[in-house]
């Protein structure tokens, strides 16, 4: 092989190696930010035709309705746990922080967090509906057939 071909081959190999390394680094960086959406049924039973379940420690988002009577608050801290349901199994969500003002039992929410047990999510963000009619598209699709409960307000002041 003459020196000119050898130099050209070396440049081509270096460029291909650089492109491969760049693609690998981009995919690695994106892997850290991927969090898939699940419903409680998909989380417990598996998602898709292969019934794939998320791994313990995986970041994910879960959407469902807060089961009435399931919200438990710790009096000494901001820790809260509640149960989510769609049309089947329930999932427990644990959260430490101030819940959104619109968070209520019987309402749809989306929680973002980490799977710590097969049916327990340690959430770092909880999103509630914006108004009576709004529901994220993912949650609306997942919760077809569930009766939505409007919050009950006592407007009679008794005076």
Swiss-Prot record:
| InterPro entries xrefs | CcmE (IPR004329), CcmE-like_sf (IPR036127), NA-bd_OB-fold (IPR012340)
The answer to whether the entry has keyword Ligase is no
The way this protein sits in the membrane is described as: Single-pass type II membrane protein
- Which SUPFAM superfamilies does this UniProt record tie to the protein? Heme chaperone CcmE
The UniProt entry lists the main location of this chain as: membrane
What's one GO MF term for it?
Answer: heme binding
Q: Which residues lie on this side of the membrane: Cytoplasmic?
A: 1-8
Q: What does this protein do?
A: Heme chaperone required for the biogenesis of c-type cytochromes. Transiently binds heme delivered by CcmC and transfers the heme to apo-cytochromes in a process facilitated by CcmF and CcmH.
User: What name does UniProt use for this protein?
Assistant: Cytochrome c-type biogenesis protein CcmE
What organism, scientifically named, is this protein from? Pseudoalteromonas translucida (strain TAC 125)
Q: Which gene encodes it?
A: ccmE
